[in-house]
Structure formats: structure tokens, C-alpha cells
Amino acid sequence: MPLTGKQRRQLRGLGHHLEPVVIVGQSGVTEGVIAAVEQALHDHELIKVKINEGPEDRHEAAEKLAQGTSAELVQLLGRTALLFKKRAEDSEFEDY
């Protein structure tokens, strides 16, 4: 289910102080990057991903990451994407 504007605003506030946990390198979005993002989302639910110069532009890379991990793209600010995926069990974000 897509996030509402209010939920996105709250997640942006929570993600403001986070550091990027995954960095997309010059090879772009690969299966290894998607696996790393998937694991980070499972561990943290809300993560930042730094997107460096690569074969695709930052919008394409962020969308590919969101689709590849079934996550919601909360925000794309510059080269940093904020992704959210709620855990099925034991989630810190029950209202989402």
C-alpha cells in the first residue's frame, strides 16, 4: 500500500539523521547492491542509500532499487535515496 503524504513526512523526519548504509558505485544497481539493500531494509526498515555516478541517472537507480526490493521510495534528495520497507513481524513502524 502506498504511503500517504503524512506518513512520508514523518519518515523523512526520522530519516534525517541517518547515515547511508549502502553506496551504489559506478557499476550501478546490480544484483549484489539489491541484495545488500534488501538485507539492510530487513534489519532497519528505514535506510538511506547513496547513489554515485553510474550508468543510470539517480532517478532510475532509486526507482530500480525500490522496485527490486519491494520498498517505498520515501525521498530522493540529491544523490541520497530514503527507502522504507515495513517488516511483516516485529516492526517499529506499526502505523505504516
Task: Specify the residue positions occupied by each region the protein language model found.
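Positively charged, polar, low-complexity stretches
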Residues: 1-96
